[in-house]
Regions:
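Anionic group-transfer/hydrolysis microenvironments
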Residues: 30, 190, 307-309
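Outer-membrane beta-barrel translocator/receptor signature
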Residues: 1, 5-49, 58-61, 150-152
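A short glycine/small-residue-enriched secondary-structure motif
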Residues: 186-194
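Short secondary-structure transition/capping segments
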Residues: 38-40, 76, 317-318
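N-terminal, post-signal-peptide soluble/periplasmic segments
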Residues: 1, 58-100
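Extracellular/periplasmic, surface-exposed regions of secreted and cell-surface proteins
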Residues: 10, 45-46, 51-57, 66-71, ...
Length: 426
């Protein structure tokens, strides 16, 4: 009862749809509010969307425009830690302690020991015992994790059926997404885990993606010949950028340690476990593709499909960027042959053959083909004189990486009879 509650969730949505002459539209707005079953956790979300589908030139020119927005705000609870602490802590102990010694825990009951740090604040004589179970209620209330997220996305599609040559149509689309997230972590200096030092951290993350493609498609039937041809290109870009920082909330150390350098103002905090940490990173990758497909149907008996795709990835070094992936498939509808067309109980008998190559580039880090040097962590430093300096080390790389290719073959038979009451596929 001290860490759990009955969760309540509300969800509201309003939508409007209609049409203005040749332009159907739909708009919607939604709001969601939820409380978690673990106390202190909750989530608020607002989302909106708009869709327009105008049609012009006697329905030869068609558009589809979509835009979406989402904003979400969360408070996360350390549910796993709180539940584990509740199972470990002596249930006969109170939530709040009695006595001045519990001032160092914000009044919450915790198992205390004498403080014996390398740098000791005389006003802080006790600290929490890391070998004892912590107070789960204190954990929930003294650790605050807040997150904000915004997401914008849009897609624009256009399709044009050529006047006087309606078997040919041109299609193009462009989509984009932008996401921004921010998370703040604050651990009280009265907490079990960061007693006295406390902790405050901030993480920012941004990403945006863009994907565009264009293709032409021609489909026509010439007597017993049915042809469908498609050719096009696609390009995509993915960008990521992140930043985080964290530091201890220990004003006493700042006020009572000598300054090493008057110009920089750096303090002698080499023994301070709450030293500030910062990290920033960014990466991106892109993909360029060209593709084509041919479908040929003769007499509705013999079907041939061939495809070809060429993909160029920024994840590989020059000379290894491109992969080429052909495929072919053949199907024979045997039950459409003259020697079987009078067999009334036979619904389907088809022979299938296929061959193709596919490529894989996922799971490979961006710029993995480039030798990079990485700055060491703050605790992996080298002493030089009175200062400590971070080191750099080369990261692993492979400039021979290229597309992982897989070749597949397949053959099969489809059979159905007695009005499809009996069927199988091999």
């Amino acid at each position: 009862d001290e860490i759990f509650r009955t969760a309540v969730s509300t969800n509201h949505n309003v939508s409007v749809q209609g049409g203005l002459k040749n332009m159907p539209y739909r708009a919607s707005v939604g709001f969601n509010n939820s409380n978690g079953i673990v106390k202190t956790s909750w989530m608020n979300r607002v989302n909106a969307s708009l869709n327009l589908a105008p049609s012009l030139l006697d329905k030869h020119l068609n558009f589809n425009i979509t835009s979406k927005f989402m904003y979400e705000k969360d408070r996360y609870a350390d549910a796993g830690g709180a539940i584990g602490a509740a199972l470990s802590m002596n249930p006969t102990q109170p939530v709040f302690g009695e006595g001045d010694q519990y001032a160092v825990t914000g009044g919450y009951y915790q198992n205390l020991i004498n403080k014996s740090d390398a740098i000791t604040d005389p006003n802080w004589k006790n600290t929490t015992n890391s070998n004892a179970a912590q107070n789960p209620v204190a954990l929930l209330n003294q650790k605050e994790i807040m997150a904000h997220a915004r997401d914008y996305s849009g897609n624009f599609e256009v399709d044009y059926k050529i006047h006087g040559f309606e078997d040919l149509h041109l299609h193009a689309s462009l989509g984009a997404q932008y996401t921004s997230t921010q998370q703040s972590d604050e651990i009280s200096k009265y907490s079990y885990s960061n007693n006295y030092f406390g902790w405050a951290g901030m993480t920012h993350y941004w990403k945006y993606n863009m994907i565009g493609n264009a293709y032409a498609q021609y489909a026509h039937k010439f007597g017993v010949h049915d042809i469908d041809v498609t050719a096009g290109a696609e390009q995509s870009h993915y960008h990521r950028h992140g930043y985080n920082q964290g530091f201890g909330t220990d004003d006493y150390l700042k006020e009572n340690n000598p300054i090493l350098n008057e110009e920089t103002g750096y303090y002698n905090w080499q023994h301070n476990p709450s030293k500030r940490s910062e990290q920033e990173w960014a990466n991106h990758n892109s993909l360029v593709s060209y593709f084509g497909r041919l479908n040929y149907n003769l007499l509705d008996r013999y079907l041939i499909t061939t495809t070809f795709r060429a993909d160029g990835s920024s994840r590989f070094k020059k000379g290894h960027k491109w992969g080429y992936f052909p495929s072919a498939a053949f199907a024979w509808k045997i039950n459409h042959e003259s020697f079987l067309k009078d067999v009334k109980w036979l619904d389907d008998l088809k022979l299938r053959l296929g061959w193709g190559k596919t490529g894989q580039q996922n799971g490979i880090d961006d710029f993995y083909y480039t030798p990079l040097y990485v700055v060491s962590n703050s605790y992996a430093q080298y002493p030089f004189g009175n200062d400590y300096h971070q080191t750099v080390r080369p990261s692993k790389y492979n400039d021979k990486l290229t597309w992982e290719k897989t070749t597949t073959w397949n053959a099969g038979i489809d059979f159905a009879a007695l009005n499809n009451r009996f069927s199988f596929n091999i």
